[in-house]
UniProtKB/Swiss-Prot annotation:
Keywords: Isomerase, Pyridoxal phosphate. HAMAP family: Ala_racemase. The lineage of its organism: Bacteria, Pseudomonadati, Pseudomonadota, Gammaproteobacteria, Oceanospirillales. It comes from Alcanivorax borkumensis (strain ATCC 700651 / DSM 11573 / NCIMB 13689 / SK2). Substrate binds at R128, M299. This is Alanine racemase.
Length: 353
């Protein structure tokens, strides 16, 4: 076998969900399992964390429908809400909670009354989705008069994961003010806010990336936050070549040896979901020893420096997991672990442990 493999660890998912619940205190924990459970598998992630959380969060109705069709009865929040009357009716039929983030959704609800649980989303400064505070208050009044009163207020922090965060306090005050005026529960905390701002926990938190063993911060590791690795990506060495000083490696000859080196060829590439934009110097580990990527990532292969290492064809190369922190790989690539998890393709073997 080629040996390119993704290992999903159920015990780590459970640990991380319990860690979120511990931090949340009395607040409900809605585990975000959108985007195929951040690349871990929608059903796998949901079923593994069922006993540790109060509900689940998805982005779109089809994800929620899949969960319901597989017997998951926990409350499910659909973060993008509904796109048309048909989806609105389906949300009611499936007993889903839907986010109302725009005035056109308010009008659609008023024109198509449905017994659906509504969370009004307040734009408290992120300027992506959400009603302005005055719009949210007006929408709540109109929906209540029509017999479909919202059950909660939610918002989303823009900068809770940043070292110098000057926005979250203001956002919390704005969203909290709307919730207080409407006398409704508030949900605003993502992973970063759950870990960092106890005041923001309110009545419901919506952790995502921390559940999958990754830190939302660049100054604290997942292990330091009490999280465990749930996603390990590995491959095998399929060749080792001697390269002389002045010789280049890979497409575009982007890396040139300054002295004689031993270059390992690894059976993984962007066709498997390894980031094509990973630069030379990105960490990998051979038999538990960290070394680096050299040259450009190909569709099916990468090349790494194994000079001085005890390395043979067939040996395992960890791309991220126990030795190589996924967040270090993400930083090297100028991206975030969320993208790395989500872009793994169907080609690597999946192992559930």
């Amino acid at each position: 076998m080629r040996g390119t493999r993704v290992e999903i660890r159920l015990a780590a998912l459970r640990n991380n969900a319990l860690r979120a619940a511990e931090l949340a205190g009395d607040a409900q924990v809605f585990a975000m399992v959108k985007a195929n459970g951040y690349g871990h598998g929608l059903l796998l992630a949901a079923e593994t964390m069922l006993d540790s959380v109060s509900g689940l969060g998805v982005a779109v109705l089809d994800e929620a429908r899949t969960l319901r069709e597989h017997g998951i009865a926990l409350p499910i929040l659909v973060a993008e809400g509904f796109f048309d009357a048909e989806e609105l009716e389906a949300a009611a039929r499936l007993s889903l909670e839907v986010v109302v983030h725009s005035l056109w959704q308010v009008e659609l609800l008023l024109a198509n009354p449905c017994p659906v649980r509504i969370w009004l989303k307040v734009n408290a400064g992120m300027n992506r989705l959400g009603l302005r505070p005055n719009e949210a208050l007006s929408a709540a009044a109109r929906l209540s008069q029509a017999g479909n009163a919202p059950v909660g207020v939610m918002s989303h922090f823009a900068c809770a994961d940043m070292d110098e965060d000057i926005h979250s306090e203001k956002q919390l005050l704005l969203a909290g003010s709307v919730a207080e005026q409407l006398q409704l529960p508030l949900s605003a905390s993502n992973s970063a806010a759950l870990l960092r701002y106890p005041r923001a926990h309110a009545q419901r938190v919506r952790p995502g990336i921390m559940l999958y063993g990754s830190s939302p911060f660049n100054w604290q590791t997942a292990a330091e936050l009490g999280l465990q690795v749930s996603h390990r990506f590995s491959a095998r060495l399929i060749a080792i070549n001697a390269v002389e000083a002045g010789e280049s490696v890979g497409y575009g000859a982007t890396w040139t040896a300054s002295d004689p080196r031993q270059i390992g060829v690894v059976a993984v590439g962007y066709g498997d979901g390894y980031p094509r934009h990973a630069p030379s110097g990105t960490p990998v580990a051979v038999n538990g020893v960290v070394t680096t990527l050299v040259g450009r990532v190909s569709m099916d292969m990468i090349t790494i420096d194994v000079t001085g290492l005890s390395a043979s064809v067939g040996d395992e190369v960890e791309l991220w997991g126990d030795v190589v922190d996924v967040d270090d790989v993400a930083r090297a690539c100028g991206t975030i672990s969320y993208e790395l998890f989500c872009q793994i393709t169907q080609r690597p073997e999946r192992t559930i442990v």
